[in-house]
Every structure is written in C-alpha cells, then in structure tokens.
C-alpha cells in the first residue's frame, strides 16, 4: 500500500529529525555560552525561551513556568494538536487542488480554416500547462507555507518572525532533498524517468536558486538587517517575471521567434501542430472569438492556444496505440467477466495511464492517506455502474410504462409474388396486460394494387389478457406478367381497451387513451418481389463505408424484379488505394448461386485491422454477368411432353425442365422451343414461337444499376471516439471534481479501500484495511466540516477555490500558534521548529504525491519538476507579500522594517550551496549509463538517495548549530 511504502532512508531521516530536535533542546540548557545579539528579537538569542508569546488566535497557557511533568503534557497536547491541524490542512488542500484542477481544465472552442476552405472546430485549453503549474498549482501545494508567513507578520504587529520564513526555507530543503531522494528510490529497478520539458526545468531551477540568493542579498548585502519597500515589492514582482520566463521557455519564443513557422490541423485530436522551416506558401487561418489570425503572425503564439509540436504529436500517437491495445486485450484477457467489470477495468487502466497534473497526484495522495480510497478506481466503478444501470433503464423503461403500446414488430416486410400470403406481427408492450386490447388494421395501395397484386384486407386484432403478440396475414396474388417490385401499406388504428365483460360474455370496449395507444411503427410497408423474371442483380448502393475493425465484411447482392430459376453471379475484389494480399484486405473471388425464389446473397471479405487512428482507403467489389444454370449447356429446352426425355426437377421461365435420355432416338416433339443459335439458322420460327422466344429473352437475368461497389475502409468510429475520450486530459477534472453537496457529504462519511499493491485487476471490490478505518475516523471531522465547501461545479471551480483558501488560512493561523507554543514549551527555537516540524508537516502530502507520480507517470516532470518552481513561488509570494506589507506599513509610520539576517541568511546560503549539488547530480544522471533523473540501476539509485538525504540532514544539523550559536552565522 502507498501509506506503508516509504523508503528506509526516509524513515531513518524522520528518526534523525526527532533526535536532532531533542539534542538541541538539551544542549540549550547544558551549554552556558550564549550571546545576545539582537534587541528584543528572538532570532538574536542563542537559546530558546520557556516564556511564550500570545499567538494570533491562541492565548498563552498559564502558568508560564509549569513543572517538568506539566511541560511534557503541554508539549504533547501542542504536538498532537499541530499534527491534527496538519491533517485538516491536507484535507482542505485536497478540495483546494480539486478546484484548481477544474479551473485549469477549462477549454475554449476555436475554428480552424484549412487551405482548401474547409473549417473544423476543436477545443484548446485556456490555461497554458507551465503557467498553471507555476501559479495555481504551486499556490495550491504551497498555500500553508505562504499563508503562514503572511499571517505571522500581519498578526504580530507587522514585525518579522522566524516561523514563516524558516518554514519556507525548510520546506524548500525538504522538497529539494527528501522528496527527490524518495522519487529516485521508488522507481522500480532498471526503469528510469526523465524530465520531458527540460527547458522549463532549467528556468524554474535557476529561479529557485536565485530566489534564495536574492534573500541573502537583501538581508546581508543591500541593506543589512533592514528590508526596504522596493526590496519587498521587487521580491513579489519576481513572481510574475519568473512565470513569464518559464512560459517563454515552454513556447520557445526567444530563438524560435525568428524562425518562420507554419501551423496545420493535426490528425490527432484535432489539435494544432507547429512546424518550423521555410515560409509557407499558403496560410491556415484560425478564428478565435470571431477574429482571424494568420498562420505566421507573431500574436498567434498565445499561451491560451496550446500549439502542439511534432514531439507531442508523436507522443499522442503512441498513447493512442496503447489505448487501442488495452481495449482489445481486456476482452481477450477476461472473457468471463461481466460488462460492469470490463468497463471498470477499462476505465481504470485508461485513467491510470493518462498524463496527469501535479494537482491530481496531490489529491490522490491525500485521499489515500485519509482513508478516502483510490479516486481513479472509485470513478471507474461509478462510471461502470452508471453505464450498466442506463442500459437496464433503457431496456426496462418500456416494460414499466403504464400505457400499453401497440405497434408492428418491424416497419418493412418483403415477400415473393408466389408466396401466397405474407405474415405481419403486431406487438403489445407495457401497460396492464390483464386488459383486453383491440386494434384495427387496414391495407392501402402503394405501387401495388388491391385485387391484382394483393388481397385487400381489414379487420380487428384482439389481444386477450396476457397476450403480447398477434399475427395478421395478407394474401398475395401471383401472375405471369413481368413487373417491377411493388409495395402496399398496412395501417393500425383505433386502439380500444376492454373495461369489463358483460354477463353474456360480450366485451364492451371504449377508447381509453391513458391505458393503450399506438406505438411506432404503426404503419408497415410490404414489398412484393416479382418472381416471373430470373432477376436483376445489383448491390444495394454504389459506395459503402466499413470500419477496419469489422473483421469480416458482408455485402448483400440483391435480386430484384423476379426470382425464378437458379442463377450464378460471379464476383471479385479489385484493389484501389487499399491493398489486397492481406495488407488491407484479403483478395476474394468466386460465384454466388441464387436458388429459385432466393432474393439475396452475401459476399464476405476479410478486412485487416492495423489499428490506425485515422484511415481512408478504398477497394472495389464487382459482380459479373449473371447466367441461368440451365443455359450453361448448349441447349435450353422448354418441354411439355415426355417422349424420350426425363424430368430434371428444375424450372425455367415457369415450366419444368427435361433432359434427353441417352441411347433413345425419338423425333423432336412438335412443342419444343429451341433457344440455341444452331436451331435458329436451320428452322424459322413462327410468330407464336417468336413471341415465346421474346418472352424467354425478357426473362433472362441481367445486371442492375450498381454492379461495382466502392468500399471505403475507415478507422472504427467507436474505436476512434473511445480513444479520443480516453486520452483527453479534461476527464481528470471530472474525476476529482464534485457536482453537489450531497455527493461531498456521502464521500465524507464513506471509508474506502486504499491502493492495491499487486494491482492484479481481479475486478473484485477490495475491502478497506485497518489503516483505512483508523485514518478515516481520525479525519472524519475534517471531512464532514469541509464538505460544506461549495462543489467544484459552481462558478467553474472558483467558489471552491475562494472558500478553500480562506479555510487554509484559518488553519494555518492555528498551526503557527501551536508550533510557536510547542517550541517555547520545550525551549526550542522557532527557527528550528519551523525548519524541522512545520516544514515536514506541510510537505507530507507533497511527498506522497511525488511518490505516486514517480511510480505511475512516464516522465519525471510531475514528480520533481514542480519542486523547483514551488520553491521559487514560496519565496516570491510567501516572503515577498509578507515583507512588502510590513515594509510599507513601517515606512508609512516613518520606521524601518528590521529583519535579523543571522539565522535566515545562513540557512539560505546553506540551502543554495546544497541545491547546486542537487541539480548537478540530477543532470549528471541523464547520462546514458543511468538514463534519467529518477530510477536507474539499484546502486545508482541508492547512492543518489543517500546523498540527498545526507544533504538534508547536514542542512538541518548546521542550521540548528547556527541557531544555537555553536557555529557563527552571518
């Protein structure tokens, strides 16, 4: 399980934290060498103080100097309360990150005009991924640290404190060393994860190191011990400057600005693809909000319009192939599973392999830690249940309808002219089946006429109690006249329901529209195929579209205007842009033999599925000249005398066909009609024989209108649409978002199973573990409380965003007071408490989020790419905003905002040196012998993780030594 998968190095680090904290709290009392360097400022003291100060919210716990036992009790209460507050912050931060995921997933529709004049509509994300990661995403993951710094300054009469800035620096150290060490270690042996957007990583890493270097400059170089207004404001304004630089790197706007580019509508997902090269000869125009933007105009490079480069194009194609493989393998792997289980497995696998944001991993980690379960599996199960339930509702809704529907089973019927009668089925569905229902029917002429082509029929059908199906018959009149296919109509009308039966058994019927009515179809069309002709053979249509996943394609060859005699029709496939021989389809040829009265046959062609996302290839299917089976011989005779002939059991043009008996010489009967040419030359025909010959020729089978069928092979529509849905990132916003307060309260009180270790896709619901129950009951108060936060559906996530950040600020104020009171209770300095305990508490959710991202994501960006950007944002927002407010306040009162440079400047310098080492090692790991920033051979993983953990321990150790004046700072 995720919650028990911390590495041994990280566990060892946690133990060392406690040892270091206890060591320095005792050294504080054992050592006598202390100095007082500041004036009333605690940062200048070399020892902690047992005397606590009033917090922003919490009062002082009196008396100030309790006994040793009371100190232990108080420290325990403060520590437990602080941990509980950290749990609360994690849960409300989960809601906060959900709102951010929804906000950054917003899309806008644009229209692409192609050079040929065609237009297509597609959607693009409003938020650039890099911009959202550095603004809302970073704010979401670092909100407690940022708000703690601001609240501490504003809550203590705009004076500088140690807790906020030290928490920011300590959190940065924890993120840079411990989180990256964990991510390096948890990747399976032999696997690697590389940073995909290396340019963005370089920019954010440089800004991260610069941010802490800048802190040292304003504290110790520019104006030692004083933060001026311009320094505070410039620190804050570095934040948007950093975002712009990262966006420029992501969009390649510096060097690439001077390279001509062209844009085309990409085949994948309808996205816009960027190409670099020569000036294009034609323009692709793009409409956004009604404005047309030319393809090579610089302003086209808007971050809101997510232009995809070829690299992304290839990645999407690979992802689609992977999705197609999953869809095909699931049914083969689990043929015994029911539809709900298969849907759940497919949804889970697809969601698991999607590219995810930092916000998603943070939400997933928090919910797994607090017993809320795996949101991907829960969403997949919910979707499966909805799909199955909708199917059941659609099939059962008619059965539960209170009104009986009366309708024909099908809207069209076909029959041959010699069939005698045609049967039509009437269905009764829904309503009270104990009633007796009457419905009238009546035939109506179409191209067929009553009396000459069919028998006029009308009457009433009675559905007795319990009966749901009735059959009516209409007589068909056969003649020997060649005719086109004809049709007539049969109408249903006048539905009546029997309310009661009289004593003599006669049913009394009345119109009750609330009990029964006509359904659809209430009119049936009957087509009569003429059987006096050998037939006209044709395809249904000249062009047909088939999916490449169809497997065996079946094409109908129709026999119209007659069905008399046995006829052979040859057929064959012809290559077009699609290739035969098993490449796109298998070559097929042969003959169709239509038996007497048979009106349709099918040709089967195997289509090869090569899993192309978009496909448009053609081949042709052609039928040849039809021939009667008997006319394949030299003579075709119509006989009405036996003589020296024997009956064959076959018919030609309505007459029995005879065959001459060998070794018997009889004169040719006078009634023989010859069709062979040799007899035409020797024997003139009478007018009667000529008429019979003409009729016989008219009855020969011929080809119809569509003798050549164009077959267009396309990608499977279901396959294409499914893949599009699976790979679309915005689905994750639906997974983490909520639609109603009811849904939120149900989630709050429900305990769910955490992560599976084996992930064996068993399809069986996993029961919550003991850990899940314990964490659920520990956090249920926070879950229910924060269920009152508006759902992410409202205001596109902004309502949830605003309320959540206010809640985080309130809890952070409590955490600041508890941490400060905990420190003074055990005489631990605020700076040490912040660097060790507070930084650790605020970073635990990020630790688990990075661990999940490192193991599940294809790249290292989601796990460690956000660390550097978050560190820079912490300084520019957390310290920049707080110090700007304080500096302006003091300047307005004619005072200076004093900040002791000692401990903070030393910590910043130490962190900066270690950060250079960290980034250098990560870049070295990209060499071929290791292959990426994360993972790699076991030895390399272990050495890297141990080095980073050692850097963090050294940072804690030296910062604590400096705080207690055992080594000299700045």
Curated annotation (Swiss-Prot):
Going by the entry's taxonomy, the superkingdom of the source organism is recorded as Eukaryota
Cytoplasmic face: residue ranges? 93-133, 189-201, 250-797, 843-871, 925-941
Q: Which residues bind Ca(2+) 1?
A: 417, 453, 479, 483
Where does the chain bind Ca(2+) 2? 417, 478-479, 531-532
Q: Which biological process terms from the Gene Ontology are attached to this UniProt entry?
A: calcium ion import across plasma membrane; calcium ion transmembrane transport; calcium ion transport; cell communication; intracellular calcium ion homeostasis; positive regulation of cytosolic calcium ion concentration; regulation of calcium ion transport; regulation of sodium ion transport
Q: Where does Ca(2+) 3 bind?
A: 417, 479, 481, 483, 530, 532
Q: From which residue to which does the signal peptide run?
A: 1-32
Q: Which residues form the Calx-beta domain?
A: 393-493, 524-624
Residues annotated as glycosylated: 41, 157
User: How is activity regulated here?
Assistant: Activated by micromolar levels of Ca(2+).
Q: How does it sit in the membrane?
A: Multi-pass membrane protein
Question: One MF term from GO for this chain?
Answer: calmodulin binding
Q: Which residues carry this modification: Phosphoserine?
A: 282, 389
Q: Which residues bind Ca(2+) 4?
A: 453, 479, 483, 486
Q: Report residues binding Ca(2+) 6.
A: 584, 610-612
* Pfam families linked to this entry: Calx-beta, Na_Ca_ex, Na_Ca_ex_C
Alpha- repeat coordinates: 138-178, 839-875
Instruction: Enumerate the Extracellular topological stretches.
Output: 33-71, 155-167, 223-228, 819-821, 893-903, 963-970
Write down the SMART domains for this protein, in alphabetical order. Answer: Calx_beta (SM00237)
Where do the annotations place Ca(2+) 5 binding?
548, 610, 612, 715
Question: What are the alphabetically sorted keywords of the record?
Answer: Antiport, Calcium, Calcium transport, Calmodulin-binding, Cell membrane, Glycoprotein, Ion transport, Membrane, Metal-binding, Phosphoprotein, Repeat, Signal, Sodium, Sodium transport, Transmembrane, Transmembrane helix, Transport
Entries under NCBIfam families matching the protein: caca (TIGR00845)
Family label: Belongs to the Ca(2+):cation antiporter (CaCA) (TC 2.A.19) family. SLC8 subfamily.
> Could you tell me what this protein is called?
Sodium/calcium exchanger 1
